[in-house]
Amino acid sequence: MNFLQNFCRSKFIVFERVTPFTHKIIHKHSHHQTSSFNPMPSEVSLHTSHNFPHTTF
């Protein structure tokens, strides 16, 4: 669990730094994917599902 938490935290930190770039990508995805079937708010779902494919370094 500890490793996972640290991993996620670092992912979020990386994500924050590249927000201007990734948000353009994410908004393209969000319009036709998340809103239709995801019960969560779009921001939350994007951070969980789309965060990883786009920010793996």
Curated annotation (Swiss-Prot):
Bias kind Polar residues: ranges: 33-57
Region Disordered, annotated ranges: 31-57
Name of the protein described by the UniProt record: Uncharacterized protein 156R
Organism taxonomic ancestry: Viruses, Varidnaviria, Bamfordvirae, Nucleocytoviricota, Megaviricetes
